[in-house]
Amino acid sequence: GCMKQALADAGVAREQGDHTNAHGTGTHMNDSCETAAIHAVFGEHAKQIAVVSTKSMTGHLLGGAGGVEAVFTALALRDQFAPPTIHYEQPDPECDLDYVPNVGREMSMTYALSNSLGFGGHNACIALR
């Protein structure tokens, strides 16, 4: 899929991924599928990646969501700070990654992905350094 292709296009090994700004709509359908995709792409390394949903703070910006979330991802890299996934209250057993629940944190990161998928069939991912 697009995450694997973004990593390949950027010349980044899956073990180098530090942070992913997920599409993260907070729905079972999206979040469980996106979690499974992250596991498929990153393997055992998936558990070490800070996976956040900035959509939890902005709401769904429809056509603007991908651009705004890419900016959030660039700022996270610049500031070495993973923003929180706010309103994270009831973990889904199928969603077993580090979602940075409710409180952001400083962390060392070199590479990050920003995912955008859904409405209209778009499916995009950008790798940033």
Model-derived features: where do they sit?
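Conserved "HGTGT" condensation-loop signature of ketosynthase/thiolase-family condensing enzymes
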Residues: 1-129
